[in-house]
Amino acid sequence: MSNIQVLASSQLSDKIIARPTTKFHPSIWGDRFLHYNISEQDLVCKQEKVEELIQVVKKEILSSNHDQLKLIDNLQRLGLSYHFESEIEKLLEQLSITHHQNHHDLHDASLWFRLLRQHGFNVSSSIFEKFKDEEGNFKESLITDVPGLLSLYEASHLSYVGESILDEALAFTTTHLKAIVANSKDHPLSHQISIVLHRPLRKTIERLHARFYISIYEKDASHNKLLLELAKLDFNLLQCFHKKELSEITRWWKEHEFAKKFPFARDRMVELYFWILGVYYEPKYSRARKLLTKVIALTSITDDIYDAYGTIDELQLLTKAIQRWDINCMDKLKQEYLKTYYKVMLDSYEEFEKELKKEELYKLEYAKEEMKRIIGGYFEEARWLNEGYFPSFDEHLRVSYVSSGNVLLIATSFVGMHDVVTHETLDWLSKDPKIVSASTLLSRFMDDIGSRKFEQKRNHIPSTVDCYMKQYGVSEEEAIKELNKRVDTHWKEINEDFIRPAVVPFPILVRVLNFTKIVDLLYKEGDDQYTNVGKVLKESIAALLIDSIPL
């Protein structure tokens, strides 16, 4: 939490209060995204052209029976599938009853398996038994089938817990794909292999993959010119929408003077919008996206108040005030920065209420309760630091499961999603379903491993890594290895909750999956790309919010 012992503010109410010395770097973007000017006429023209091409694709391509697997894969990879959801669903239902024995080609069998599993069809991994030899190993002849290896590698990331054949497939393909990159740098698929070895499709943010794949698809001699044109136009159109949204949210941030009022907090508005863009990018979720971005911005400030600035007495008063959620509690907060924060928090949720229909308010109330929960978790961690308490691994998880913020963000992501979210959805969420639990634990472990170096530079509560080391008497390396094994297991558990019939609508499950993908991007490099904005995050933001695709 701080580089010095937290002091009781009641003893220092009329004196200078000793504050933590944690310093976060300022925004690297300045006012770059504050203004975005595009005429409505230009937007309408772009939309009309995209819509025109969509209708042509439906008529000329989707009605064809030619290579439906490849078509669905390309629509998804090019970022176009959201335009053709019903058509893709119909095709997948037809493909699901296609006998897999017809797929003797490794690439096609793997693609069939992956596409169906992605959409919740519980197809059996026994389809890959035919590619093994008499000794139970994958056939050596497959090593030269590079497209097949690549397709099997991607399919292996849709595995469930205990599916040994897919674990074997992952090990087999990883070994040989790495060898291709190392020994055949001129191989036409070498660059693509390097990318997916680092982050497979299952763990990749959809829009980032679309940006990458459009350039790959364009170089493919067999590409469909109509699909390529639509993909480019659609990507650039969505980028216009997103830049317009980011401009609105950046103005909200500026008008509230958050950076000035809370100079100790991370100023990461652009990074936060990118984060939420990874959760849902589709135009129909604009309202949900803007609301969630504002909530995550408020949560980031809250985290820094509890983790890098507030004294234990201040935090105790603030926690009580938040639990009551009553503007009259503001008078009990002694410090001006806390009064300002408290009013902004309550005012923001009042504004959110105005944006929702009366029959939608129960969703916001649920999300508000999650905000109270996370703040309770923040205070528990502050108390640990103040008392020098070292929790057990299990005790740490009980609190840090909440303070990770994952459940809060998932709940809040549902608020603006219109009719797809119902009372039943929130009832499902309240029972801590496997996909949410797996995503949250995965996020907790990756966060703690990724932010470890930075946190060690200041006085901070023990992480799950520290607690695991102490509880089980192992080294840091061994603890990290074990937590990474758990991360792999949690990915498999996420896959399992997509199996049809799902308890909640598919878009709900996708939100949870997408939150997990963002965490993978932010923390996989072994650092915290959000706190200390690094190369990966900067390049990702530029790819989606700065650089358009040449037509």
UniProtKB/Swiss-Prot annotation:
Pathway: Secondary metabolite biosynthesis; terpenoid biosynthesis. It catalyses: (2E,6E)-farnesyl diphosphate + H2O = (2E,6E)-hedycaryol + diphosphate. Its cofactor is Mg(2+); Mn(2+). Pfam families: Terpene_synth, Terpene_synth_C. SUPFAM superfamilies: Terpenoid cyclases/Protein prenyltransferases, Terpenoid synthases. Mg(2+) 3 binds at D447, S451, E455. Gene3D superfamilies: Farnesyl Diphosphate Synthase, Terpene synthase, N-terminal domain. Its EC number is 4.2.3.174. The Asp-Asp-Xaa-Xaa-Asp/Glu (DDXXD/E) motif is important for the catalytic activity, presumably through binding to Mg(2+). This is Hedycaryol synthase TPS20CT. It comes from Cannabis sativa (Hemp). The gene is TPS20CT.
